[in-house]
Amino acid sequence: EEYDATMSGSMRELKISIPSLMGGTDITWHYNEASAASKVAGNYSGTTSLKVGPTMGPFVSATVGYTITANNDGTINVTASEEKYTGVTMMQNLTLGTYTVKNLAYDKATNSFSRDYSKDGIKVHFKATGGMMERDENYEFGETSKMTVTLAEDGTLTITNNYKVGRMPFPISATYTGKKAK
């Protein structure tokens, strides 16, 4: 069925009135740029390069996924998939489980999202096998744990994640690079 409609306003504020539809219907379209959080939201696949302390590494996990969701307040949540590394000094085979860092805030000056999550109580499953340091347990991210997310104009996502796990003596620095999954 067809209904008579009127359009008024500008291309940035368009109103469509349909008086005979459901007792009268108005649709108002507000043009606005997509938020930075909306632009970065999605599922990504790529690689992570990991360093333990100042000298060990880099070690590479070649098939890593990240999911980024936009929050209504303009922040984002970042969920890491499981990451597997081989040949890691003292640990040999290292698996880091999935975890989520919430409410990374946007900084327009650096065009990036970041959060110090060291006091958020987030835990990660840490499994090390085949080396001098065998572990298979959950650890809380500790002091100096900070994540920064940047989306380049070409769609490349970079996540810099510097953290400590439990009482381990060395900080870990990880750099993820990926693109939106198809």
Q: Where do the model's predicted regions map?
A:
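Predominantly extracellular/secreted and cell-surface proteins with exposed
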Residues: 1, 60-145
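A short hydrophobic beta-strand element
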Residues: 12-14, 44, 78-80, 113-119, ...
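Tryptophan-anchored aromatic micro-motifs
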Residues: 31-60
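Helix-rich interaction surfaces within compact, conserved domain-sized segments
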Residues: 139, 149-152
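Sec-type signal peptide cleavage vicinity
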Residues: 27, 56-57, 65-72, 172-176
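Short, cysteine-centered beta-strand-loop-beta hairpins and adjacent loop/turn segments enriched
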Residues: 21-23, 51-58, 85-95, 125-129, ...
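Edge beta-strand at a domain terminus
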Residues: 11-42, 96-108, 144, 152-182
